[in-house]
Amino acid sequence: MSGTELDEPGKLKRAVIDASAGGVAGAISRMVTSPLDVIKIRFQVQLEPTATWALKDSQLKPKYNGLFRTTKDIFREEGLSGFWRGNVPALLMVVPYTSIQFAVLHKVKSFAAGSSKAENHAQLSPYLSYISGALAGCAATVGSYPFDLLRTVLASQGEPKVYPNMRSAFLSIVQTRGIKGLYAGLSPTLIEIIPYAGLQFGTYDTFKRWSMVYNKRYRSSSSSSTNPSDSLSSFQLFLCGLASGTVSKLVCHPLDVVKKRFQVEGLQRHPKYGARVELNAYKNMFDGLGQILRSEGWHGLYKGIVPSTIKAAPAGAVTFVAYELASDWFEANLT
């Protein structure tokens, strides 16, 4: 066995490091960006227009319209805690999601590179980064989906609540739609996550490569490290995550809107918040996209895009920076 192989952490230990770092990163990111996520979900499940300019030709009176007005309404009616509504299932979703995602991502990259060391992963083709990200996203989605659905249901309601807690939402979904109801919208979610996760991880790796090239060319050689990942500052990692989160969200947002509609269709909704999405309103993802486009226009496919983009940028940045730092800490203390 070569010295290089001996220096690499064991496969099980490496998996624990990736899963643990991913879980920590996901939890931190979720806590920081929850307010924007709640606003985004309120917009996405609202059938009425959400933008002030879109109300001119509409006879409907929406509950929410405009980012700042919605923020004030939620704070006035629900208090500060309203911005973290659905946060328990969100954390129960995001911790296993990011744990699985980063563990699978590292496994796929290790298989492709023939090594578990990060510096060898940096040499992989950008296309492999996109493919690895897509596979990791699919695995993580399937493993944590019921919590994602419960998060959407709880975050989409204001006051008065239809579902007082996660348990009541869970029982109502099972009674209304059966166990399979916990996976409502899984198909469009998987179709969404393939380009989304692929773009997120692929662009992140691409931006990291560009940053490393920049450092090599414009910084003194004495400050560079033998490990490419160490040659980037936390701020550079933050910028890479910021850019990757923004790009992936802008491209995939319409699919996220359809996913949210599937998740809440047929469920109770207080009349105060407008019309509900009826059960079996959409035959499939493409029918959902078509119906939203016909009844709500292009704006309907991009409901919540402003808070979503504002959220995606720091969420991506915080997730990747937290993962890199947590991974380094776990590796230093567990290996």
UniProtKB/Swiss-Prot annotation:
<keyword id="KW-0813">Transport</keyword>
<feature type="transmembrane region" description="Helical; Name=4">
    <location>
        <begin position="182"/>
        <end position="199"/>
    </location>
</feature>
<keyword id="KW-0472">Membrane</keyword>
<feature type="repeat" description="Solcar 2">
    <location>
        <begin position="124"/>
        <end position="210"/>
    </location>
</feature>
<dbReference type="GO" id="GO:0090422">
    <property type="term" value="F:thiamine pyrophosphate transmembrane transporter activity"/>
</dbReference>
<keyword id="KW-0999">Mitochondrion inner membrane</keyword>
<dbReference type="GO" id="GO:0005743">
    <property type="term" value="C:mitochondrial inner membrane"/>
</dbReference>
<feature type="transmembrane region" description="Helical; Name=6">
    <location>
        <begin position="304"/>
        <end position="323"/>
    </location>
</feature>
<feature type="repeat" description="Solcar 3">
    <location>
        <begin position="232"/>
        <end position="329"/>
    </location>
</feature>
<feature type="transmembrane region" description="Helical; Name=3">
    <location>
        <begin position="127"/>
        <end position="150"/>
    </location>
</feature>
<dbReference type="GO" id="GO:0005739">
    <property type="term" value="C:mitochondrion"/>
</dbReference>
<dbReference type="InterPro" id="IPR023395">
    <property type="entry name" value="Mt_carrier_dom_sf"/>
</dbReference>
<feature type="transmembrane region" description="Helical; Name=2">
    <location>
        <begin position="88"/>
        <end position="105"/>
    </location>
</feature>
<keyword id="KW-0496">Mitochondrion</keyword>
<dbReference type="InterPro" id="IPR002067">
    <property type="entry name" value="Mit_carrier"/>
</dbReference>
<keyword id="KW-0677">Repeat</keyword>
<keyword id="KW-0812">Transmembrane</keyword>
<dbReference type="Pfam" id="PF00153">
    <property type="entry name" value="Mito_carr"/>
</dbReference>
<feature type="transmembrane region" description="Helical; Name=5">
    <location>
        <begin position="231"/>
        <end position="247"/>
    </location>
</feature>
<keyword id="KW-1133">Transmembrane helix</keyword>
<protein>
    <recommendedName>
        <fullName>Mitochondrial thiamine diphosphate carrier 1</fullName>
    </recommendedName>
</protein>
<comment type="similarity">
    <text>Belongs to the mitochondrial carrier (TC 2.A.29) family.</text>
</comment>
<dbReference type="InterPro" id="IPR018108">
    <property type="entry name" value="Mitochondrial_sb/sol_carrier"/>
</dbReference>
<feature type="repeat" description="Solcar 1">
    <location>
        <begin position="13"/>
        <end position="111"/>
    </location>
</feature>
<comment type="function">
    <text>Mitochondrial transporter that mediates uptake of thiamine diphosphate (ThDP) into mitochondria.</text>
</comment>
<feature type="transmembrane region" description="Helical; Name=1">
    <location>
        <begin position="13"/>
        <end position="29"/>
    </location>
</feature>
<dbReference type="GO" id="GO:0030974">
    <property type="term" value="P:thiamine pyrophosphate transmembrane transport"/>
</dbReference>
